[in-house]
């Protein structure tokens, strides 16, 4: 009984740490995507001020 309880407790701790890691990793991915979008928008805005060629700026900055 005691070993079953210890095993269950250990399993719960492992699962909680996996869930915690997954949530931190998901936040990291969201922030990476947000930074990428900000960079693309900034690149596009600067390019448009310089060249005014929308098609070229979309190609240059990777904006779809």
Curated annotation (Swiss-Prot):
Question: Iron: present as a keyword of the record?
Answer: no
Tissues of expression: Expressed by the venom gland.
**Cysteines engaged in disulfide bonds, as pairs:** 43-61, 47-57
GO molecular-function term, one example from the UniProt record: potassium channel regulator activity
Annotated signal sequence range: 1-26
Q: Where in the cell is it found?
A: Secreted
Q: Name one GO cellular component term.
A: extracellular region
Residues of the propeptide region, as annotated, are 27-36
Alphabetically list the UniProt keywords: Disulfide bond, Ion channel impairing toxin, Neurotoxin, Potassium channel impairing toxin, Secreted, Signal, Toxin, Voltage-gated potassium channel impairing toxin
Domains: entry comment: Has the structural arrangement of two alpha-helices stabilized by disulfide bonds (CSalpha/alpha 2(S-S)).
- Member of which family? Belongs to the short scorpion toxin superfamily. Potassium channel inhibitor kappa-KTx family. Kappa-KTx 3 subfamily.
| Role summary | Potassium channel inhibitor (Kv).
What protein am I looking at? Potassium channel toxin kappa-KTx 3.4
């Amino acid at each position: 009984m005691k070993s079953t309880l210890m095993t269950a407790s250990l399993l719960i701790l492992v699962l909680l740490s996996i869930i915690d890691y997954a949530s931190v990793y998901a936040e990291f991915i969201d922030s990476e995507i947000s930074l990428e979008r900000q960079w693309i928008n900034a690149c596009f805005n600067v390019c448009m001020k310089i060249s005014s060629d929308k098609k070229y700026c979309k190609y240059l900055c990777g904006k779809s």
